[in-house]
Amino acid sequence: LPLPPHPGHPGYINFSYEVLTPLKXYQSI
């Protein structure tokens, strides 16, 4: 199984925006 992106991984920022940001939006509803 692929490991989750590390904080130093280039894709970590994209992962945060695509996952954490939508979660915040859903919580505000």
From Swiss-Prot:
Q: Does the keyword Phosphoprotein apply?
A: yes
Q: Kindly indicate whether the keyword Secreted belongs to this entry.
A: yes
Q: Tell me, which GO biological process terms does this entry list?
A: enamel mineralization
Entry's Gene Ontology cellular component terms: extracellular region
Q: Which Pfam family is one of those matched by this entry?
A: Amelogenin
Q: Which residues carry this modification: Phosphoserine?
A: 16
* GO molecular-function terms, A-Z: structural constituent of tooth enamel
List, alphabetically, the InterPro entries matched: Amelogenin (IPR004116)
Q: Where in the cell is it found?
A: Secreted, Extracellular space, Extracellular matrix
Name the keywords, alphabetized. Biomineralization, Extracellular matrix, Phosphoprotein, Secreted
Q: Which family does it belong to?
A: Belongs to the amelogenin family.
PANTHER family, per database record: AMELOGENIN, X ISOFORM, AMELOGENIN, Y ISOFORM
Q: What else is known?
A: This protein sequence was found in 70 kDa-, 20 kDa- and 18 kDa-rabbit teeth enamel proteins.
Function of the protein: Tooth enamel proteins are produced in ameloblasts and play a role in biomineralization.
**What name goes with this protein?**
Amelogenin-like protein
Which organism is this entry from?
Oryctolagus cuniculus (Rabbit)
Gene field: AMEL
